[in-house]
Amino acid sequence: MPFSRLFGKKEKNQMDDIVEEGVQRVLELPMDKIFPNQFQPRTVFDQDKIDELARTIRIHGVIQPIVVREMEPDYYEIIAGERRFRAVLSLELEKIPAIIQNLDDEEVAAIALIENLQREELTPIEEAKAYRSLLDMQDVTQEALAQRVGKSQSAIANKLRLLKLPEAVQQAVLNKQISERHARSLLALETEATQVDLLAEIEENHWNVKQTEARIQEILGVKKPTTTKKTKPKRQAISRDVRIAMNTIKQSVTMVKDNGMDLDFKEEETDDFYQITIQIPKKK
């Protein structure tokens, strides 16, 4: 089966056609002979949903078989249906119905990615790693991959940029401690150490994206020259205070003169200071 066929599928029933193509029968395979998909993009499974599925299986059994491929004699890798496998495992059942398919690594990786994308269950980091895996496997561009999985090229590129973040930040996204927008905003910071430090601030203060972006602007602003901005208000404040002092003195002199006191008032200005001389005669 050509690898490109996998990327052209949009609907879930079409994906089912792929994994069931050439199916002869459903087998009951031992649970201890089955292991998870090495290309499974999902690393975080919702245990509540697994438990809910297990309760359904306990009552109705496994309605839809899992799909596997034989890796070694009597050892099988899951292609599709890992949640069903985990649910059956939690029930401690010995066997699970399965369909065996002969698919290569690239086809298995593509099916795992597309299945999860259709269900919209991947975290942004899981999705990014799946895209990276497929790009590494196939000599295709981001644009070609985007067309095949029904995404825009910019969406693929934005997801891949998340993989440039430190492991601690990626893990926080996986665990849903911060959002994808939080994570993308951290890319504006130059060093991993600064990114990790800000991650701690976000978690400690429960900042939303807007607050996080404001903090990033503060951090970036520290590196910019601010001497002129700091001294200008200071000079304005000093100039304003001097004018107030000068006006107060002049008003006082005027009041004294209005009361009949004869005095001389002289004002001189230098580069460094104002000089005021007031002469009051001892005798009238």
From Swiss-Prot:
SMART domains: ParB (SM00470)
Pfam families (alphabetical): HTH_ParB, ParBc
Repressor listed as a keyword: no
Origin: domain of life: Bacteria
Annotated keywords: Cell cycle, Cell division, Cytoplasm, DNA-binding, Septation
Stored InterPro entries: Chromosome_partition/occlusion (IPR050336), HTH_ParB/Spo0J (IPR041468), Nucleoid_occlusion_protein (IPR023705), ParB/RepB/Spo0J (IPR004437), ParB/Sulfiredoxin_dom (IPR003115), ParB/Sulfiredoxin_sf (IPR036086)
Entry-linked SUPFAM superfamilies: KorB DNA-binding domain-like, ParB/Sulfiredoxin
DNA-binding region coordinates: 143-162
Compartmental location: Cytoplasm, Nucleoid
CDD domains linked to this entry: SPO0J_N
A GO CC term assigned to this protein in UniProt: cytoplasm
Chief site of localization: cytoplasm
GO MF term (any one): DNA binding
A biological process term (GO) from this entry: positive regulation of sporulation resulting in formation of a cellular spore
NCBIfam families registered for this protein in UniProt: nucleoid_noc, parB_part
PANTHER family attached to this UniProt entry: CHROMOSOME-PARTITIONING PROTEIN PARB-RELATED (PTHR33375), NUCLEOID OCCLUSION PROTEIN (PTHR33375:SF8)
Job description of the protein: Effects nucleoid occlusion by binding relatively nonspecifically to DNA and preventing the assembly of the division machinery in the vicinity of the nucleoid, especially under conditions that disturb the cell cycle. It helps to coordinate cell division and chromosome segregation by preventing the formation of the Z ring through the nucleoid, which would cause chromosome breakage.
Family: Belongs to the ParB family.
Protein's name in the database: Nucleoid occlusion protein
